[in-house]
Amino acid sequence: MTMTTNAERKFINLRKRLDQLGYRQPLAIESLPLVEKLFSDLIHTTESLRNAKLAAGKTEKESRNVDAILEPYKTENARLVKENNEMHLGLLKLREEKDRISRELKAYIRKLDHETSDLKFLNNQYVQKVRSLEKDSNGKTERILQLQEKNMQAVVQTPGGKKRSIPFRRQRMQTDELLPSSGGYVPPAVAQPDDPYIADLLQVADDRIQELQKEVAQLKLDLERAQGGIKHLNKQVEERDKEIERLNRALDGGRPHDVISLEAQNISNEKLIAHLNLQIEYLQETNRSLEQRVDSLQQKKKTVSSEVADLSARNQELCQELTQIDQLAQQLEKDKEMVLETADMELQEAKKAIQRQQRELEGQEEVISTLRRDMADGDHVKDQLRNQLLDLQDQNNKMEGLIHFLEEDKKRLQDKIEAMMQEDKEMVLELERMRARHGMCGKDHSPSRLDAFVKSLEEERNYYREEVERYRLVRGRTDRSPTPVGRGRSPRGRGSWHGKRDGDAELSRVVKERDELQSVLLGFEKHMEDIQTRVKLLTAERDQLSSQCQQAQEELRRVQRELESSELQRRIRDDREQTEAELQRVTAERDALRDRLKVAHSTALTDREQEEFRFLDLENTIEKLEREKADLRAQVTVLKESRVVVEKELKAQSAVLLQNVEEATQQRVESSALRLLQEQMEQSLSDVQHRLSVKTNELQAAHQQIDKLEEKIADLSRHGSSQKDEVVILQNTIASLDREKDTLQDAVDQKTESVVLLQQEVHRKEETLLEVRLTVTDLENSLNQLQAVLSSREREIASLRRQLDQSQEELFSVSRDREVALRENRRLQDDLATMTRENQAVHAEMQEALNERDELKLRVHSYISEVARIESLMAAKEQENRDMLERFRSIHTESEDKELKLQQSEGLNNSIRLELLSSDTERRHLRERVSLQDREIQEHLNALQAYEAQVSSLARAMSRLEEEVQAARAEKASVLADLASVRELCVKLDSSKELTVRQLTSKSMELERVTGELEDVRSEMELLKKQLGSERLTVRNLETLLSTNRQKEFQTHISASEKESELKVLKDRLALADSKTAGHAREVSQLRGKVSQLQTEMDVLKRQLTTERFERERAVQEMRRQGLSFSSLRSSSPLSTSLSPRPASPERSILRTPERSTDKTQDK
């Protein structure tokens, strides 16, 4: 069974496939394996055939695409060749540019070398000049010293008998009248035969001439070098032409080589002609500019000659002024004494000024201390005012918030009141309606119940209004609550009233509305309580602010009492008064606002019209407050600005005060130094005076000789004190003179250095002037030579112009013929290029169409193969379905699995069917596209036929053009014969042109060199003019400086010599005073020895007196004892009288000795 079923299945599949392929002949079961094998071979062969066709199509396509592949390589090759040519041209240009730059740099290096050589030469000249000037200055200084040593010296005899000579003391000689002028011949002062500068400048001129000759030789070498460079450039041009010919041969397609070479020759000829024209124009312009420069140089020569004459005259004037300077020196010596006297006066005035400044400094320090205290107080007041302003701003912000809050409450309450009024109206209307309705219906039953209910509602409304007004009036009594009374009064006759159902519903609604109104009133009462608490807070803040304002006012008054001294305090007081007034006004406005708020709170819920008016008033007040707030802000800004100004003024005053303090400190230091010196001198004086007083006290106790010595010592002490005072004064004057001497010496050194530098600059400028003169003469000679050369060159240029005109005419005729031929050739080439481009485009379109057709055929074959494959799959699937049906019959147990498989296979079948449908639709579309492509191919073929017709016509035109070209070639042969003759002429012209070009280049080089030299000369002339002007100014300044320096030198020299002499005199005086003081000290020591001897003698006399007294008393007692009278004792009185003066002196000495001892102890 299985074998038969397999054979049947194979037969059925094979039969289907044969039917699909169109083989509908009968098939026997016996031939089934053969046919199956043949069928498989057929399928294999068809697939191999299809693969072969595909391979063949691909190879054909690739062979067709070879040209298309090669085309970009060809274009790339052409582009690379073109870029190579461009790079080669760029290389040639870069080489030319490099050679040009190297030539320019070499020329510039040569120019710099020449300039450096010139500068070295000038430097050597200047060094030699400086050395000669230094030698001259050394000789002059030695001569001045010799003359000063030969001057008569003043001799001063000191008190010790010594004689001292004072050097550099200039002796003065007064003459009554001058010597009479000589009547003989006076030689002119201008003649200066032995001038060393002229010889030096002539040598410089000779050296310059030699350098210029060397430069001429160098320029000749440069010309030869330039000619060699021109030859090198010609060789480069020839090599470039050869390279162009090589590249033209290398190029494929395009224009013929002859046409390109002709164009290149024409372009080069045009460039040469344009270059020659430019050179001719440039030469004409250079000739004009050179003529103008020659004229300007002649004018400059005249001006330079006039300036030289002026300078020579100026030289004479300077010589005369030197003589005048010598005369001024004598006057300066006279002026010096006056200067010294004035210096002494100024010293005294300076001392007085120092004392006055000390007093002023003390006053300024007091002022500074007061100002600092004022500033500290002002800063304190400023901080307080700033804090008050901040508090006021905070209060304003709070008030604004309150006002906004009240406005919102006002709006909300207005809305509630309007709603309540509307509800009252509706209630009244309802009640009237109900009254009318119930009155009509139930007059007998309840005639006045509604009226009583309405009256109770009105009473409740009035009660609530009264309660609100009472709360508004009370303001702060929030503990009591009117709600129990309302609640006790409100339900008045609710239980006893019974009506209909409609009336009950309306009454319940009214009761609900009443309860809602009561809740609203309760909320409003709470809101009023909040407002009252806020008002309390505001009142507390107002009290606090008022207390702070009072404190600030008290502080301001205290500051006002303290700050009543200066303008700054006055300003601060004014600002403070303004701020106080503003604060009072702000507080008044704040109180007014609070009163208004109270009034607004008290009359908040009375009537709508009153509330509207009140809100309008509040808005106006708010606007006023905003305006006032803006004014306050403006005033605050003004106060801030004034504060800034005051701070700036304080800073300026503080800076001034700091400067004053620094100056005061400096003056204090100086005054302290002077005070220390003064105190030292006073101490020394007090010590000396004290010593002298001690000495006088000691000498007063001595004998008459000691009295005489005391008088002498007193005289000497007075003389010594006066001498010490003089010594102090002299020391001060010496110190001041030393300082002045140092300053004068520094000034003299500086002026001498500046004089030396100025003299060097003068000599340098004279040398440059002489060099400029020489260069001007050289330039004049060179200009004359150049004018001669230019005249000859102009004649040569005129002949060359005539030759160029002839050659240009011939070239114009040849160029016209050539341009005609070129135009025809270009036109033909353009036509050919357009035809070739069109043909290429048509071929490309044809190729694209064929490629698309092949692709479509391949797609159709692929679709057919896919359809066959899908059909075979469908057949296989159908066979499988049959097998599955047979299995379903045989195997019932696996029915569920098979059903699932069937469902899957059905889904696959459906998808395959959908794919087949889509493939059918695609096949139809492809057929349509193939038909369209066939139509397009037909159209392209028609277009090709038309293009072929055009090509044939173009071929005919080309044949005609070839005939014309042959005729043109014949004409060309004749033209070439003519061109040969023209070329011979051109060769001759080229040879003459090369000569002319060489001559022109040499002339251009020479002209450039001459123009460069002329520009250098012009710049040098301009520089010389500027230098002459500046030198004139410097000469004038130097003259004034020389005169002033010489005067100052004379003054300083004279003052220094006199001060030195005075210093020596003072030193001698000091030595004398020292010797005197030493002698006095020796005398004082001798006197002290004598005093000690006298004291010993006085002690001996005291002892003798005591012994005598004792003996006298004893004698008296003995005489009394013996009975002698007192008269008898008178006989011994001469002894006592003779000795009477002596006892007095010892007693006095005894009395004075302890005093002296006490004085000595005090001194110790």
Swiss-Prot record:
Q: Which residues form a coiled coil?
A: 77-153, 202-423, 454-649, 673-1041, 1084-1118
Q: Which residue intervals make up region (Homodimerization)? A: 13-66
Query: What biological-process GO terms show up in the record?
Result: centriole replication
SUPFAM superfamilies xrefs: Tropomyosin
What cystine linkages occur within this chain? none
Keyword Coiled coil tagged: yes
GO CC list? centriole; centrosome; cytoplasm
Instruction: Cite the residue spans of the region called Disordered.
Output: 475-505, 1121-1164
Sorted keywords for this record are:
Coiled coil, Cytoplasm, Cytoskeleton
Q: Could you tell me where this protein is found in the cell?
A: Cytoplasm, Cytoskeleton, Microtubule organizing center, Centrosome, Centriole
**PANTHER family reported for this sequence:** CENTROSOMAL PROTEIN CEP135, NUCLEOPROTEIN TPR_MLP1 DOMAIN-CONTAINING PROTEIN
Quote the function comment for this protein: Centrosomal microtubule-binding protein involved in centriole biogenesis. Acts as a scaffolding protein during early centriole biogenesis. Required for the targeting of centriole satellite proteins to centrosomes. Also required for centriole-centriole cohesion during interphase by acting as a platform protein for cep250 at the centriole.
| Record's subunit section | Homodimer.
The protein, known as: Centrosomal protein of 135 kDa
What is the source species?
Answer: Danio rerio (Zebrafish)
